[in-house]
Regions:
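Short substrate-entry loop that stabilizes the transition state in hydrolases
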Residues: 57-59, 67-104, 192-193, 224-225
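Alpha/beta-hydrolase
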Residues: 65, 95-97, 186, 247
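Alpha/beta-hydrolase active-site loop
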Residues: 110-150
Length: 285
């Protein structure tokens, strides 16, 4: 369900290629005022990266949720997200959940591997759903609290996005009344959908409760497009501002796969997402 299958390998390969070829990565970090931030989630000390436009603000802000990869902070993922949103006037905060990169706590994939080894795949699937909606979500919301404390952030214009496990996190957070104005889940549950009936039910429930605009996005060759076919119509039925898009099969093949191949494929969805967010948070509330 959560192991490094072909889709994840493609993402990691995309991150590696981007790391090798993005000569402007370090320059972008400075240009986007990148800061390493530590913060608490319960008793754990977590780490995140904060990016902001020049000037005092107040700016709209985006919380970016990474996937299940062990070391999201060691790739160009966050800098690439910043390269899309900071020039458009957004603060970006990328909290790293427990066990990822330099954040304290147990890595979720290690916990799931152990549960599956001891109790089987069904138990692993149930644990994944429970962790995603409890401790993992707690970590995201602790990151959101960091954003809300920044004096240069307009707390009336907060949005959330993320890919894969991060897409699931985005939907679960959108269900909560925590202050987000819009949500952009990308490749949400595409790798978990077929093998986890509990997660399918949980996400259907979440979608039925979401009251903020959602833009649900999938690449054309994602691991599974059934989430778009199941969750999409319900979203569109509930709110005329909601959007669902499976992108056309264009461009390099790896950018048509899970999470658009990672950092190198973010340009595929960037302009669509910015246009969607402009409609929702383009003016101060």
């Amino acid at each position: 369900m959560h192991r490094l299958n072909a889709g994840v390998v493609a993402i990691l390969a995309g991150f590696t290629i981007a790391l090798q070829t993005a000569s402007g990565w370090s320059q972008d970090s400075a240009r986007f005022n990148k800061q390493r931030v530590t913060f608490k989630s319960g008793s754990l000390t977590l780490v995140g990266y904060l990016f902001k436009p020049d000037g005092p603000g107040p700016f709209p802000a985006l919380v970016w949720n990474h996937g299940s990869e062990k070391n999201p902070g060691g790739s160009p993922q966050f800098d690439t997200v910043a390269s899309i949103f900071v020039p458009a006037g957004y603060v970006v905060f990328a909290p790293m959940r427990r066990g990822h990169s330099d954040s304290e706590g147990e890595y979720i994939v290690d916990a799931l591997d152990r549960e599956e080894a001891q109790r089987g795949d069904l138990a692993g699937a149930k644990l994944a759903t429970r962790l995603l909606e409890t401790s993992q979500l707690d970590d995201q919301l602790a990151g959101l609290a960091v954003v809300k404390r920044q004096p240069f952030v307009d707390t009336n214009r907060l949005v959330v996005a993320g890919c894969s496990y991060g897409g699931i996190q985005t939907l679960l957070a959108a269900e909560r009344n925590v202050g987000y104005r819009a949500a952009v889940p990308i490749s949400a549950a595409a790798q978990s959908w077929a093998g986890n009936s509990e997660l399918r039910t949980r996400l259907k429930t979440a979608v039925s409760r979401i009251r903020i605009p959602v833009f649900l996005i999938y690449p054309p060759r994602d691991a599974n497009l059934e989430p778009a076919r199941v969750l999409g119509p319900e979203l569109e039925r509930r709110n005329r501002m909601n959007r669902v898009k499976v992108f056309p099969a264009e461009g390099p093949e790896d950018e048509q796969q899970h999470c658009f191949g990672g950092a190198k494929g973010m340009h595929v969805w960037g302009s669509d997402v910015l246009a969607f967010l402009k409609d929702v948070v383009g003016r101060r509330a």
